[in-house]
Amino acid sequence: MSGAGSKRKNVFIEKATKLFTTYDKMIVAEADFVGSSQLQKIRKSIRGIGAVLMGKKTMIRKVIRDLADSKPELDALNTYLKQNTCIIFCKDNIAEVKRVINTQRVGAPAKAGVFAPNDVIIPAGPTGMEPTQTSFLQDLKIATKINRGQIDIVNEVHIIKTGQKVGASEATLLQKLNIKPFTYGLEPKIIYDAGACYSPSISEEDLINKFKQGIFNIAAISLEIGYPTVASIPHSVMNAFKNLLAISFETSYTFDAAEKFKSAAAAAPVAAAPSAAAPAAAAKKVVVEEKKEESDDDMGMGLFD
């Protein structure tokens, strides 16, 4: 290795070591067909909230091995280091970095021999191609017609499917039509967070909900088996307080917090008494009136006996 090459290697190792020891959150992404200018734009976009490391996987793995004693959790990354791997280091804003990455995508022509990342459909309508090129389209089994001195495609054409290898004829046609069917950018494959790896499709909200559910499950199990944990202690304290309060109501034993509840309970019947008196008086009046009517009927019947 030349002196210049050795120097570049040492600079890369020093930079990578600093990044791996500074950050605990990372996005591991594939960088196929991502150019240097595009990568530079991504670096500029995330400046202040993250950093980008692009290099050979053998070099990155060497740095991870060298840090095995101080940061053994980094070994989880080795599984995801591929040929064209880019690592984006983040602070506490993975969602923002992912958003920036998604906006930094550029259109690209279809090149022969490339596997299509998405379907390619040519719409029906004018092509701008001269009638002399009709045979070229016919070889691709595309129905055409001549309209106003140019070739029109009769029906929509599904020319390339996802995962299909792009042929030379398809690539030439798309170039003639000035269609750039593919977009390329960094493709996040895994999120690394302090030794844990998960899919980039999982949002921070999903993680928070899972965390809450885990705490709930731990608390439930702890309460069931009577084994105190940080998650169950608040519930245990509340249950103990309720039991103590119940004992205070049934016995002469009391304490400051119980007195507040006792005072509230004692005031409740007093407040309800005036409202309860009115229905009782009304009911009494109805009973008296009914008895009075019965007495009148008896008196009337006696006059005609």
From Swiss-Prot:
One GO MF term attached to the UniProt entry: large ribosomal subunit rRNA binding
Cystine residue pairs: none
Keyword Ribonucleoprotein attributed: yes
GO biological process terms held by the UniProt record: cytoplasmic translation; ribosome biogenesis
Coiled coil: none
Keywords: Phosphoprotein, Ribonucleoprotein, Ribosomal protein
This protein's GO CC annotations: cytosolic large ribosomal subunit; extracellular matrix; lipid droplet; phagocytic vesicle
PTM (free text): Phosphorylated.
Subunit-structure text: P0 forms a pentameric complex by interaction with dimers of P1 and P2.
Summary of the function given for this chain in its UniProt record: Ribosomal protein P0 is the functional equivalent of E.coli protein L10.
PANTHER family xrefs: 60S ACIDIC RIBOSOMAL PROTEIN P0, LARGE RIBOSOMAL SUBUNIT PROTEIN UL10
Similarity field: Belongs to the universal ribosomal protein uL10 family.
Protein name: Large ribosomal subunit protein uL10
